Amino acid sequence: MKMLIKRAKEEKEARKLQPCRMLENPPDNGLLVPQLVPVAYQVYEAREVLLSGVSKLVKVIPVQKCRFCHELHIGHVGHEIRTCTGPGSGMRSSTHVWRKGRVHDVVFSPKSYHLYDRVGKPRVVHDESRRVPRIPAIVELCIQAGVDLEKHPTKRRTKPVYSIEGRIVDFEQAKENDENEPRNFILDKETDQLEESHEGVTDLREISIGTMESWFKMISGAKKIMEKYGVLTCGYCPEVQVGPKGHKVRMCKATKHQHRDGLHAWQEATIDDLVAPNYVWHVRDTNGLPLDNKLKRYYGKAPAVVELCVQAGAPVPDQYRSMMRLDVVPPDRDEVDLVA
């Protein structure tokens, strides 16, 4: 703590000696990080292929969603593990009530406010909550890293901004820039080609392998972008905001939100906050009996996308092999009392 206080004092004295300075390091100075622009396009394209592949797989592999909580299950019959925490769960002994799931239940991404100018106006206030659009956080991260979308315009600078006594000042004149239009066309064209190549595949196993590859490609690319571009999450609720600062919209309803007047408690986000993995129970035998509540300590888990692709024929990834507990042999239901 003493070192942090000393560093803060030194930075304050440096600002007094040089009140007007040009920010040099992107993206803090309003410019893009050149080496991350192609990564952003790869992440965006991988997300489009992922959604296309999952939409095909859910037509063959059923997805079950609890009516009262966020529990998800991949399989023809929902599991019998009593973990429901939704309304009326006490009357049902925490048993889930299953309904048919959708694509966005498998690939869930929280929404984030879209920032037109991430440096000049990095924060959305409460009165602007109805006017500023909310888009998936992974898409907003790609836009801030260099992806240009016609539906969600953003300001691109060619000169760095200045900091005058801690305030960001932009001396660049506003002018129309049409350099991004060909890039939009190229992006749409490449995405269409990827979707067409995906649609031409009829083998379920090939679709599952391609879908899982796009999942890992999206995750790895997003991690690289998050090293430079800030992503914040609330410490009490799942709200996510992509940008250097968190928004001021009073919408938090988690623990002690009354003491914070509904404001979020922002902290640095991880990849799981940006792209929720949504862990589900791993089913070894899709044609067997439902997962038993008494045997839940013998079952493993995996992200919903991974479990869906594995049941469709994709090989089990090495990084999730131990989590799925493939080396554990669960006993039969009549052998529970005989196992230590």
Show the residue positions of the predicted features:
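Core mature regions of organelle-targeted
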Residues: 39-42, 54-68, 84
